[in-house]
Amino acid sequence: MKRLSVLCSLLLVAAALGTELPLATPCDEEACKLPDCRCSSTNIPGGLRARDTPQFVTVTFDDGINVINIETYREVLYGRSNSNRCPAGATFYVSHEYTNYQLVNELYNRGFEIALHSISHRTPQAFWADATYQNLVQEIGDQKRQMAHFASIPASAIKGVRIPFLQMSGNTSFQVMADFDLLYDCTWPTTALTNPGLWPYTLHHESIQDCIIPPCPTASIPGPWVLPMISWRDLNNFPCSMVDGCFFTPDRTDEEGWFKFILTNFERHYLGNRAPFGFFVHEWFISSNPAIKRAFVRFMDIINNLNDVFMVNSAEVIDWVKNPVPIDRYRQQQCKFTMPSICRPSFCGPLTGTHNQLSYYMTICNTCPRNYPWVGNPLGQ
Ligand SMILES: *[C@@H]1O[C@H](CO)[C@@H](O)[C@H](O)[C@H]1NC(C)=O
């Protein structure tokens, strides 16, 4: 099994090295049509009017899932529904180290989306900028299998990627995504295309998106979608990709100020071209700032009661863009269904990390591995 996967990786590398990727050419709307191709643009998919377009809100959290941060997720997310009575979504970009996979299984069974954020989340950031195809096969491609195995969830449910530090390596992560059947990337910030906002698109053709953290892809790579991280604006109009990265903000104890700050950013989308509105944040920022947590909860309480706003898993946004329907038809659709997936937990450890000789403990939904799973040995065999 391991030898087979090594062989597969080698074949993929050979395929990647053997052919230089074609440079993307300017997008031709006539040649690039939904559901599988979309030019990068701020046009609303399907030519809908803004008032007929569902305003999607994507709440996302990054990094490991553990017994501490799950408390916040349970408190602020569980039991929420949108106005169409479908459960509200959120997406977790999970890194492997110190993740408790029993809790990943719990989030999955609650209908939330589990996505990839690398096995190691290693520093320095330059590692990701310079990452080779093989590096990213081991960090992202292999993580899909690892996540499915330890959290006992279907590999087909794992669709999204966010690279650590929002640091892309040009074409490479998208090539890996195409080869490992991953649907979309949510790593690429835009500060230029925020009002009106950039809608998700594919990389068949040249992207019009500004490259904030180079290198960005320039090849034609059919397959994966880009779900742009549309920046917020702070109180001095400086852009920020992650909410916890905004600089000039209301005081962290000012609930009312934060509530208005969130709404102001939301309204740029809601009263504009309704490009998906992202609330991209780390759990520590919410749990260590109770006033911001209350403001965030108030914001969700409001949007969960608006008839044209839907807090969804990020992959659901891509599903809608591929097949855009107006709000009234969207509201009639059935809610997404998650087939329950049982976790029989094993508490494993101490397991030695063969890369650093540290002892690790893991809670997983499978039999315990021999070694601590890591880059190059994702199942810890
Ligand atoms: C991406 O691929 C294009 C086309 O082959 C190439 O010109 C470009 O240099 C590549 N980008 C990086 C960062 O390697």
Swiss-Prot record:
Keyword terms: Carbohydrate metabolism, Chitin degradation, Disulfide bond, Glycoprotein, Hydrolase, Metal-binding, Polysaccharide degradation, Secreted, Signal, Zinc
Q: Please give the SUPFAM superfamilies that the UniProt record associates with this protein.
A: Glycoside hydrolase/deacetylase
The entry's note on the tissues where this protein occurs is:
Strongly expressed in the midgut. Has little or no expression in other tissues tested.
Q: Report the glycosylation sites.
A: 171
Q: Where is the signal peptide?
A: 1-18
Catalytic reaction(s) noted: [(1->4)-N-acetyl-beta-D-glucosaminyl](n) + n H2O = chitosan + n acetate
Cofactor(s) the protein requires to work: Zn(2+)
One record GO biological process: polysaccharide catabolic process
Would the keyword Amino-acid biosynthesis turn up in this protein's UniProt record?
no
The family assignment reads: Belongs to the carbohydrate esterase 4 (CE4) family.
Its recorded name reads Chitin deacetylase 8
The organism is Bombyx mori
